Amino acid sequence: MNSIKFNIIVIFILFSIINSTPAKEKVDNYSVYAKLPLLGEVEVQKIETELSIVDSTFEYSYYVAPTKIVDFFDKKITSGYILGSLENNSVNTDQYYLKTEKDDFSRIIEFSYINNVIHDVSVNPTYDTSKITNVSEIMITESVDPVTMFFKITNFEFINGCNKTIKVYDGKRRYDLKLSNPKITDESYICTLTHQKIAGYKPEKIKENKIYVSDLKFLVDENRSYKFSEVSLRNNNTDLIIKKN
């Protein structure tokens, strides 16, 4: 009787192993360069991301640290993740977590999503929003978080042929990234990326309505697939170029 029970247990374990789906994991590294007067491009940050997929669910973690090559650039360390599912070349985020740390200060930002829509927002400690334009509830619910945005623009299957607008909310600011005008060659696929401030900025910045235009670039790899190469974004009046290592 004990032998029969043992055999049943062994068969059950083997069946579970055979039918379990192994996680697919990928780690990517990026360098962030700032365009500085007189100095040109200077590496100011390192980014590491890790993607783990089981069936259609995923976890995507994100870590940013300064290089300390220049003393005056942002010295914050940022870490976080998103959880969600991947379906039909689309990213459906369920949870977002981000922590920023600098010296003895830290801030945690969390979003929970329902049906791929931001439902709850927690920012601790809160930002001082007394001098910036209001971000409405509708503006928030139509958006995604910055890590989801980065995951999308660095993976070719999620850019929808360079014909989409990614609406982003980071817990304070609301902005649009519009992808358009694909330029296709034998070796590359380049989208025009238009960055526009929507809300959560000083009123004069919104009134100025200054639009930043750059390129989102993918290169053809040895398997003839498009892989992210680089993108230029605007942050605090500084041009930042993110390049895949």
Show where each model-derived region lies.
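Bacterial N-terminal signal peptides that target proteins for export
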Residues: 1-8
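Intrinsic disorder/low-complexity signature
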Residues: 4, 16, 140-142, 152, ...
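Hydrophobic h-region of N-terminal signal peptides that target proteins for export
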Residues: 12-20
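Acidic, serine/threonine-rich low-complexity disordered tracts
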Residues: 24-113, 156-245
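Hydrophobic, well-structured mid-protein blocks that either form specific transmembrane helices
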Residues: 106-148
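Short, structured interface segments that constitute the first stable element of a domain
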Residues: 131-174
